[in-house]
Amino acid sequence: MRNVMQAATLESKFPILAVEHDCIISKDADITVAYKVELPELFTVTRNEYEAIHSAWAKAVKVLPNYSIVHRQDWFIEENYTPDIQRDDLSFLSRSFERHFNERPYLRHTSYLFLTKTTKERSRTQSNFTALTRNFIIPKEMQDKDTVTRFLESCDQFERIINDSGFVRITRMRKDEITGTENSAGIIEKYFSLSQEETTCLQDLTLGAAEMKVGDNCLCLHTLSDTDDLPGKVATDMRYERLSTDRSDCRLSFAAPIGVLLTCNHIVNQYLFIDDPAENLKKFEKQARNMH
């Protein structure tokens, strides 16, 4: 019986060209710097602290050059808690606390941040116009050494602003953490296997009209990009009624319903595209004149 399924190697479709100087280089010459994000403990952040965290992110984003992309990726994977009771510095109460939560299911939250420098043309292309299906020419802007240097300097400034806030800490990821080694998986391998485990074995990818699978995991993808689908009112945080009382508030992030409150394995990707504000202002003014 002849196999009618189309198959291709991952290498032929891979959008990444190389990882050099701890930066990810795409086949379109986009440059990406990756960070591991450490967030505050759940239910420990107040409303004022959420405002301060939001202000720090907004301040950091403003130092990035035009035509940059900020990509925040949050993993929520169901696991059973494994206590660490072999440590010598644990007290009797601490050891009892660890045993109390032994093998209890929970969502393990892992967060990454990716800062990408692209070009005006690349930032406005559609998802079906990629290096996977078309030939490409390296943009002249991305061949300019000063452009790359300024972007890397802005990334360092971005990192300092976030870390100086005192609430969130980001740590630059090195080449081995991105690509992995013989004994440990990098973020690329983890993403392609939909796992945070230290396994270097990739899963089969199945792309069909009815479903998409990675190994034994079936995927369901949702996109939220239309303003009509967004809430009428947004804020940095919200009141979590289940743990709040008349005298005290328990606050969660405004995006918690698609984050920690969504009780299944899932990944949340958030993208912020930084355009040229001066060019956009001229475009809006022209549209306003045409309307009158």
Task: Locate each region found by the language model.
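Extended, folded cores of ATP/NTP-driven motor/assembly subunits in large transport
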Residues: 1-292
